[in-house]
């Protein structure tokens, strides 16, 4: 069975209709219909400009705009009949417009191609998506600042190689994630600046012979600047790749955070409690409380990484200008944006509800010789070279492993067998509080610095 060629806007050149399977295979309306609002926005701006330069009359413009607004209302009410035989969101809307207002609807596409139309739609859509994502990043950062402020003095072990390294505060750890998200925010803001260039007016690839006013359309659509080259305008997908790159980095950060949350909720760590509403159980093991939200976010990072690689692979072999390959840009881009936004939303809801288990964190920090570096620094202040101090403390740790004693549990006599520079005041250095308070500089883990960083973070968010 074949489609009726008269359904196609380009059917005049063809002597037979498109095969029915090919029509389904090449159609994109099943996924690009989500661009409807931005497609209509672009069409209204285009019609307004055409009237301004005299290609349309004011009456024709008004008829077109009224028709497009009615179509948008139909779509949002679920009353629009999306047709696969019309290929995509653009032709579905144009066909419906012509059905509603007659021949005037056929004038809308004057001076425009689907090539520059879709390039405009995607940029408008992604611009809005980035704004939504930025708001979720800010909301998550607010939750992290709240935890950091409440837990500025809560001591936990810091890790390297997933082994106890030095004591830090839980608040300091939350601020590390705040910093990562700040970079994610900046990358997306930067990406938004570069995508905010208007391709509309590039037409198919070479521009148009009509006396269009691209500056007017640019202003109406809120773009920063008009694109400077028509070939590049219709073929560029750098902005989508750049977004997926920034989204991949953000998802990588969330995946790392997820890994820590999964570890911290486990029976082996028991550092935090997650509320039941963010967890699920097991169909067979009654005791289970599984951290599904962080596990899923960790898993979903792969989808966004895949979107980035998919777009890079899609674009790498394309000559100028537009090619049908570019139809494949939307699904990975849509999925990357959806996944990042939903993951951020889940985290923004979850992070303020985390309950640190103070006693378990402290107990873990007391194990593993977490103040060994503090003892080495103590000896440095006594005039010994750091490398010698490192070796001295290494011997003390070895002794502790053999005797089952932490450094703070050893007597002064035991400690002095490794260096006669060690005096009674060493025990103030070997406490967890002494260790974190000693790191009292910008970026350090001391509670005073955590509180100062929270204030800086609040000021940053307030300025957005």
UniProtKB/Swiss-Prot annotation:
Database matches in Pfam families? ASL_C2 (PF14698), Lyase_1 (PF00206)
Reaction(s) the record says it catalyses? 2-(N(omega)-L-arginino)succinate = fumarate + L-arginine
Return one GO MF term.
Answer: argininosuccinate lyase activity
Which pathway is this protein assigned to?
Answer: Amino-acid biosynthesis; L-arginine biosynthesis; L-arginine from L-ornithine and carbamoyl phosphate: step 3/3
- Gene3D superfamilies xrefs: Fumarase/aspartase (C-terminal domain), Fumarase/aspartase (Central domain), Fumarase/aspartase (N-terminal domain)
Keywords assigned: Amino-acid biosynthesis, Arginine biosynthesis, Cytoplasm, Lyase
Class of this enzyme: lyase
Annotated GO CC locations: cytosol
Where is the protein localized? Cytoplasm
Q: Does the keyword Amino-acid biosynthesis apply?
A: yes
For this UniProt entry, what is the primary localization, expressed as one broad class?
Answer: cytoplasm
Which Gene Ontology BP annotations are present?
A: arginine biosynthetic process via ornithine; L-arginine biosynthetic process
**UniProt KW Nucleotide-binding keyword:** no
Under Enzyme Commission nomenclature, its number is 4.3.2.1
Q: PANTHER family from the entry?
A: ARGININOSUCCINATE LYASE
UniProt similarity note: Belongs to the lyase 1 family. Argininosuccinate lyase subfamily.
Name listed for the protein in its UniProt record? Argininosuccinate lyase
Q: What is the lineage of its organism?
A: Bacteria, Pseudomonadati, Pseudomonadota, Gammaproteobacteria, Pseudomonadales
